[in-house]
């Protein structure tokens, strides 16, 4: 089944060109089925690119999904046309009285910025606190995972001395876990972050269950027992070229970035990298939508039960 997005959103044609099943609002309106309401809080500067990446993963499900795009930073964007933001994004006050089946919070290029110095930190706190009563399950990605650990569990910001960039091997830890159902015991996932997620710190200071981790990248996938908060520390949504684009961007800016690990063929930056993580990225989002959202959320969202008992 498809995701449901506005007819004029650029992602419609982008995803259809990839043979992704997309349903526009006009077509979905005649279907007598309740779609899942999923809110996407997009914190990345290049919002259209990020929309495409996440909508691709959210579309690979037998469920119809009604996507609402959310922004909380009212500053003028240098990377996304204001017309696009005005046409397709809502502000928090527009939806704060509503309930949603799912919320995805993207990463943000804020790895070396203290939480208190983030321009929209108070809004991040507000959304995450709001989600506890208004969203069945929230998926935090990369920087958002670090922010949520601080807000919900009081974990201090942990930062690596060197940026973690590359495609790393991970291992699943529980063969019966629903979030990793269908995963290979070892799988690849890309990372691009300064944030550090030591498994020991998560086990000692939270009640979260870790389902996949990496000897090099640390904890990758973990969640609360009730499945209402799910954390992914990498970037399963990345395109094949994204890590390379970040590398060349930093290089051209006069920085000395390390070559992304296990990314370019034979570590030759002139080579064309392959998206070796794509299948597990799709499976992760499909499992989250099915087991953490669809199987738990009430049919009538007006009857939202924050404890999911």
Swiss-Prot record:
Its EC number is 2.3.1.46. One of its GO terms (cellular component) is cytoplasm. Keywords: Acyltransferase, Amino-acid biosynthesis, Cytoplasm, Methionine biosynthesis, Transferase. GO terms for molecular function: homoserine O-acetyltransferase activity; homoserine O-succinyltransferase activity. PANTHER family: HOMOSERINE O-SUCCINYLTRANSFERASE (PTHR20919:SF0). Transfers a succinyl group from succinyl-CoA to L-homoserine, forming succinyl-L-homoserine. Pfam families: HTS. InterPro entries: Class_I_gatase-like, HST_MetA, MetA_family. GO terms for biological process: L-methionine biosynthetic process from homoserine via O-succinyl-L-homoserine and cystathionine. Belongs to the MetA family. The active site is at 142 (acyl-thioester intermediate), 235 (proton acceptor), 237. This is Homoserine O-succinyltransferase. HAMAP family: MetA_acyltransf (MF_00295). It is found in: Cytoplasm. The record marks 111 as: Important for acyl-CoA specificity. It catalyses: L-homoserine + succinyl-CoA = O-succinyl-L-homoserine + CoA. Substrate binds at residues 163, 192, 249. Pathway: Amino-acid biosynthesis; L-methionine biosynthesis via de novo pathway; O-succinyl-L-homoserine from L-homoserine: step 1/1. The record marks 192 as: Important for substrate specificity.
